[in-house]
């Protein structure tokens, strides 16, 4: 996860010159199962004091929920960039691939209409949904990033999720040891 934060800092500092970053995410960014100050968004804010980081992540959030909240968040905070870390709960609930992709398309369109830089994070789901759904779900993110010509960040949980010492007992959420 430390490498993820270093890359994120580098990207927002040099590529888009972001001074205000909005994180639109779910429990992976909402510090689920730990104190807020132990989660990666808070730790990122501590490392980059010249930024304003707004963590609008909510545990259990879906792409539809994020889309519904986004207009008010954009109006209130007027971010330079928005990191989109959504879709995991859609996948865990078996939502239709087309619906998830349409919601992400709408989220990105809204961000662009508000003159902010969208950054999409790849999301993966556990294999128990079957290889077909899992592959189709994973393919959403590169397709959307390519369609809008935006940055696609790798899923920061890839190496964390395979180490049980870095995960909560639910096997889905990272614990405090996994934070940078």
Predicted regions span which residues?
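Short, well-ordered alpha-helical scaffold segments within catalytic/effector domains
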Residues: 3-4, 41, 67, 101
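Serine-esterase "nucleophile elbow" of acetyl-processing enzymes
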Residues: 17-63, 67-78
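Alpha-helical cap/lid subdomain in secreted, periplasmic
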Residues: 46-47, 67-180
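Sec-dependent N-terminal signal peptides
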Residues: 3-12
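N-terminal secretory targeting signals
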Residues: 2-4, 18-19
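Single-residue recognition of alpha-helix boundary sites
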Residues: 13, 36-37, 133
